[in-house]
């Protein structure tokens, strides 16, 4: 049986070992297809990262698909049932690294646009693609750099679908219409190293800071809202001491992360945490990493178009959720447009034997195409 256009492209993309930040020629495949449709292509290479921006049309509004060609490492090869970069179909599922995250989505995007333009060559508005090879890595030279370049010249995306695997049980059951913000603090409490038998000659930073750490961990940061759960404060890493049982440590390192709703922002969090720490009698250093602001698309033409498209294909409307980690949608949201995420089932992403249901790729293609029809068909 001949592969469908979506399946054939997905296989071609998966076969390329684009472990972050490598692209391995994936973007060239997409660019070739988009050029044939009349897209203007702008390749943007920043250090080790390959990106491209493609646009068809000059009219407003500007709708864009966004995604990434890089994948996480395959992990232990011996635990895979197939070779991770040799796309294989087993029992109706396409197996391979990136099948769900997110080469299947990329294939669906391209084919959906091909089908839409074939039927509506004189569509209204403009269609774009923002593709990077730096989403699974440090996200320094990827989407954020392209967004900065576009904003600098006043080219803002009005509506965007990010192809992240948003679904849980079946494709389209969940559409992510927002994401929480993320901020990380690396806290170092200073003390004085000494012998445990002579605590009066030392200053144990673990002891001196426990009450402050407990206060931060038990603080109610907000109550959340209709779209977001309450802000979460978690401590993923702590370290102190030399490993010897008779040495009081000289420093205590605590790393914490907050996933926060639209009720807060970076400045408020920094102020509240600093005020809490300053109440206690210890010396500390605190370094911040701002991973991204929360964003929300609670209404608008894009959300209406997607909900209709998913309902048309599945006969069931999707749930609108903001759960999960961060995505490149947080950078695109800086343009103040509508940003949502719609992609395959995420049950196997980043795992060995990553796979996606072949039928889901066809459904996703139909959802993307109908979204375009709802937005731009004359």
Curated annotation (Swiss-Prot):
Residues at which Zn(2+) 2 binds: 101, 136, 350
Cofactor: record remark: Binds 2 Zn(2+) or Co(2+) ions per subunit.
Highest taxon of the lineage: Bacteria
One protein family per Pfam: M20_dimer
Keywords of the record: Amino-acid biosynthesis, Cobalt, Diaminopimelate biosynthesis, Hydrolase, Lysine biosynthesis, Metal-binding, Zinc
Catalytic activity as recorded in UniProt: N-succinyl-(2S,6S)-2,6-diaminopimelate + H2O = (2S,6S)-2,6-diaminopimelate + succinate
Family annotation (InterPro entries): ArgE/DapE_CS (IPR001261), Bact_exopeptidase_dim_dom (IPR036264), DapE_proteobac (IPR005941), Peptidase_M20 (IPR002933), Peptidase_M20_dimer (IPR011650), Peptidase_M20A (IPR050072)
Keyword Protease in record: no
Broad enzyme group: hydrolase
PROSITE patterns noted in UniProt: ARGE_DAPE_CPG2_2
Entry's EC annotation: 3.5.1.18
Residues annotated as binding Zn(2+) 1: 68, 101, 164
BP-aspect Gene Ontology terms: diaminopimelate biosynthetic process; L-arginine biosynthetic process; lysine biosynthetic process via diaminopimelate
Family recorded in the similarity comment: Belongs to the peptidase M20A family. DapE subfamily.
Alphabetical list of PANTHER family matching this protein: ACETYLORNITHINE DEACETYLASE, N-ACETYL-L-CITRULLINE DEACETYLASE
Role played: Catalyzes the hydrolysis of N-succinyl-L,L-diaminopimelic acid (SDAP), forming succinate and LL-2,6-diaminopimelate (DAP), an intermediate involved in the bacterial biosynthesis of lysine and meso-diaminopimelic acid, an essential component of bacterial cell walls.
Assembly and interaction partners: Homodimer.
This protein's name: Succinyl-diaminopimelate desuccinylase
Protein source organism: Vibrio atlanticus (strain LGP32)
